[in-house]
């Protein structure tokens, strides 16, 4: 059965000498894999529409297993991402996180629109750290992870000074600090941002400027939480961390 849908290219894998298996995140069908025959050939009509991060319209032969991609039309190439090594690292992490954090053939139109908006924002030059933090926080619910960000996990208090307890799965207030000696100290702004990014509508994002200190706190909390609960080891995350270290070194050398 032929079916048409819009999708984002999350990943491609070479298959044989001339073919690719393309993993798409689609609005209508969720995450699906399709065979793109001949897509490795330079003059193939499927080569251009099987580029990473591309947003397009795809016509495919749908089967119970791996479908076959018949043709595609680019809607947005995300060229700005692919031409920038640093942005490619961020986008690759977003794509792999979505790929590994979702099940196949489970439609989630909200997730599709959110990831599309995330890639658009990266492509247009929005701070990639901010976009990545928001994606990481939004993906928690998709993976069935629900940190307590509205009140203290122990006494339910909504006022006071809050740190983050990875062990206890959320905010812990100053009255309960002794319950987790390994809690992560964070500033009030970081606590607000964790909550904001978890519930935030990305389409409303304006110009957000975060201090490096705030970014470091967000990164520490989110990375440790993922290590403890997600069960994911992503090669793209390691590469992204290496790229961020390189970026910081380049910044220090310039100064």
Curated annotation (Swiss-Prot):
Keyword Glycoprotein recorded: no
BP-aspect Gene Ontology terms: DNA recombination; double-strand break repair
Which GO CC terms are listed, alphabetically?
bacterial nucleoid; cytoplasm
InterPro entries (alphabetical): ARFGAP/RecO (IPR037278), DNA_rep/recomb_RecO_N (IPR022572), NA-bd_OB-fold (IPR012340), RecO (IPR003717), RecO_C (IPR042242)
Q: What phenotype has been reported when the gene encoding this protein is knocked out?
A: A single recO deletion does not induce RecA expression after DNA damage. Cells are very sensitive to DNA damaging agent methyl methanesulfonate (MMS). A recO deletion suppresses the lethality of pcrA DNA helicase depletion and increases survival of the strain in the presence of H(2)O(2) but not MMS.
Pfam families attached here?
A: RecO_C, RecO_N
Question: Where does this protein reside within or beyond the cell?
Answer: Cytoplasm, Nucleoid
Task: List the keywords (alphabetical).
Answer: Cytoplasm, DNA damage, DNA recombination, DNA repair
Q: What is its main location?
A: cytoplasm
Family stated for the protein in its record: Belongs to the RecO family.
Quaternary structure note: Recruited to foci following DNA damage; probably interacts with RecF. Interacts with SSB (sbbA).
Q: What else is known?
A: The mutation previously known as recL16 is a mutation in this gene.
Q: What does this protein do?
A: Plays a role in DNA double-stranded break repair. It seems to be involved in an RecBC-independent recombinational process of DNA repair. It may act with RecF and RecR. Is recruited to repair centers, foci that are the site of double-strand break(s) after RecN and before RecF; may actively recruit RecF. A positive modulator of RecA.
The name on file for this protein is DNA repair protein RecO
Q: Which organism is it from?
A: Bacillus subtilis (strain 168)
């Amino acid at each position: 059965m032929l079916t048409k849908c819009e999708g984002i290219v999350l990943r491609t894998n070479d298959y044989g000498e001339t073919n690719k298996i393309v993993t798409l995140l689609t609005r209508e069908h969720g995450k699906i894999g399709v065979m793109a025959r001949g897509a490795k050939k330079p003059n193939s009509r499927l080569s251009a529409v099987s580029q990473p991060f591309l947003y397009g319209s795809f016509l495919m032969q749908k089967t119970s297993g791996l479908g076959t991609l018949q043709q595609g039309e680019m809607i947005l190439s995300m060229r700005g991402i692919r031409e920038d090594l640093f942005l490619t690292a961020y986008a690759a992490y977003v794509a792999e996180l979505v790929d590994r954090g979702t099940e196949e053939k489970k439609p989630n139109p909200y997730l599709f629109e959110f990831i599309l908006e995330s890639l658009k924002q990266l492509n247009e030059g929005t701070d990639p750290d901010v976009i990545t933090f928001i994606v990481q926080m939004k993906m928690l619910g998709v993976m069935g992870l629900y940190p307590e960000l509205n009140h203290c996990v122990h006494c339910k208090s909504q006022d006071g000074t809050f740190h983050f307890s990875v062990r206890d799965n959320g905010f812990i207030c100053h009255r309960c600090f002794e319950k987790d000696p390994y809690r992560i100290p964070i500033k009030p702004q970081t606590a607000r941002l964790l909550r904001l990014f978890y519930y935030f509508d990305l389409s409303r994002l304006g110009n957000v400027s975060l201090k490096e200190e705030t970014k470091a706190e967000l990164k520490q909390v989110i990375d440790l939480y993922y290590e403890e609960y997600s069960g994911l080891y992503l090669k793209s995350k390691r590469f992204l961390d290496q790229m961020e270290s390189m970026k910081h070194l380049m910044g220090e050398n310039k100064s």
